[in-house]
Amino acid sequence: MTTASSDPLLQPFTLKHLVLKNRVMSTSHASRLTRDEFPQEVYQRYHEEKAKGGLALTMFGGSSNVSLDSPNTFQQINLSADAVVPHLRRFSDRIHTHGAALMCQITHLGRRGDAYTEPWLPMIAPSPVRETLHRAMPQAIHDADIKRVIRDFGLAAKRCRDGGLDGIETHAGGHLIGQFMDPTVNLRTDKYGGSTANRVRFAIEVHEEIRKQVGDDFVVGFRFALEDGCSFEEGLEMSRILQGTGLFDFFNVTFGRMDTKMALAVNSMPGMFVPSAPWLPKAAAFKRAVDLPVFHAAKIADLATARYAIREGLLDMVGMTRAHIAEPHLVKLVEAGKEDEARPCVGASFCRNFRATCIHNPATSRETYLTHDIPKAAQTKRVLIVGAGPAGLEAARICATRGHDVTVLEANSTAGGQLLLAATGSWRRDLIGIVDWRVSALERLSVDVRYNHYAELSDVLDHGADVVIIATGGLPNLDALPGAEHCKSVFDALTETPPREGSVIVYDGTGRHNAYLCAERYVDAGLDVSLALIDSMPAQETGGRGDDQVWMRNIARWDVPVRTNIELIEVTASSNGKRRAVFQHHLTNERVELEADHVVVERGMLAVEDLFEAARMYSANDGYTDLEAFATGKPQPGHEAEEGQFHLYRIGDASASRDIHTAIYDAYRLCLAL
């Protein structure tokens, strides 16, 4: 049995003069929370929550800019101006109050920048080699610009020191320093190109200037991507050269290229379709070959893997960045012997979408108006929740934690709702953790959950509730489609046994996952599948987190026909027993007709609102939710309830068809204020 005193994760680590209180860290990432290019209140509160939660080191400022021609492509921090220093001082004081250390990543994007972002300058690189992902055609960096950028790195590091930070790291992987190291990008024939020693010269000169500006008693690390254009062996050779300079205090090792969407989703930020801790063996091999401390983060989402990495000496500090986006109080729970209560990172990569927000922790990055510590309610209420999908489960969890008397009515034999279908995909099974964690929480809280109970209006009226929350979800939106009786919905396709043979047209009218989960099921069953899309590319809504790349890869492997930009307008039965799907082409306005044995249709969900509408006339608020209060997690305006009345709300897909995060967010912000 692991105790707090013997847990490898809770042992301190000395980095130069800095004593880190445990082995858990959050690595630098672009959270998209800056305001006016600086880490202000929202940004700082996001990181402070992790410090309050017990981790030893939070690194921030992913891709922070040191120069004018490294633009604000990802809403990064601008370290090229002295105006950043007061923000860093407040930030440092805030984090240090909780006993955690604070470091910033500093970099120049090089060719990875966006030439069409202010100030609209040419991008630079060792050689004019275009990056596929960010699409800039860079100019070869001039000797004078090399000197300028080196100076900018030094000044940015000094600003970090002046701001009270404990250290910095520079970023090589895919960025300007790494571009000099990469022989496929660095085609120079001068002293900065050619041999391994020449290609690390720029990195050394940058860090010589940094040391000149910050001195020897400031922690300086190097985020180093293995096999980023170089072989693993040459990467080790480079690391030994860098280590031999005495300029560095640690290596933060990552793996692989990041110059395409797929490479980013596999290497740098491994998604749900990638195994747990995919590059830990590579990082361990790197550590065996160097003398400096080694940090590493890449889908180390669970404590068992993190503990193993430290116990076996594979790493010195373990990065659990996305795990902390899901559960910022992770270390505190470990210390208290309650790690089984930690909200799991399910690997959905939702945090890559627009901001550092978890698919099932809506408080993350919203700390200025949502708390992670759920307070007790001033007055206990009797709450009835109809539906045990993600929204209903979260509503029950929040209400019960606040001390309310909660009952949940669920029509099915198990909890989960539509999420059970979402988790049927071969690489999306971990989504079920969202359900399992909440079911376990409700068991701990002794919530009365009644399965196989289809709620009627009489159930609502007889319960005597003060608050009724409708979380009945949605059903496939086929009603307005002529010939819907000739189609299968995605619910049908994902729950029924696939036909033994025949042809199937799968129609994607939303750009979400569902159509492709169905297509995958039919391909695996050996059917002749074709895809029809309303959008110009598959799974268009999932692109922010890289899932579209997985589906496009799978489609290429399936070798199935794909027709884009066509909208399904009708399905009819043909005389030969097949189904005829009629489409309108959005670009040509032409009518397109396709035949198959089966047609599967994804057009989103329509709210199941019968019970809500029936209950409205008995409610004190007519089922109305004040949006201004709801949007900011404030209490709903008071509506005096008469005898037998209740306050009625609806959340999740029972309100409108959206996603898992929004369903849980609805529940969180409503119930936190009940």
Swiss-Prot record:
Binding site for [4Fe-4S] cluster: C345, C351, C358
Enzyme class at the top of the EC tree: oxidoreductase
Binding site for FAD: A391, Q418, R428
Reactions listed under catalytic activity: 3-phenylpropanoate + NAD(+) = (E)-cinnamate + NADH + H(+); N-methyl-L-proline + NAD(+) + H2O = L-proline + formaldehyde + NADH + H(+)
Active site: H175
Entry keyword set: 4Fe-4S, FAD, Flavoprotein, FMN, Iron, Iron-sulfur, Metal-binding, NAD, Oxidoreductase
Positions annotated to bind FMN: G62, Q105, R223, K299
Cofactor: [4Fe-4S] cluster; FAD; FMN
Biophysicochemical property: pH dependence: Optimum pH is 8.0 with R-carvone and NADH as substrates.
Cofactor note: Binds 1 [4Fe-4S] cluster per monomer via a modified motif.
Enzyme Commission designation: 1.14.13.-, 1.3.1.-
Keyword NAD annotated: yes
Task of the protein: A member of the 2-enoate reductase subfamily of old yellow enzymes (OYE) able to reduce alpha/beta alkenes near electron-withdrawing groups as well as perform oxidative demethylation chemistry. Prefers NADH over NADPH as cosubstrate. May play a role in osmotic stress response in situ.
Family that this chain belongs to: In the N-terminal section; belongs to the NADH:flavin oxidoreductase/NADH oxidase family.
Name assigned to this protein: Multifunctional alkene reductase/demethylase OYE
Organism the protein comes from: Caballeronia cordobensis (Burkholderia cordobensis)
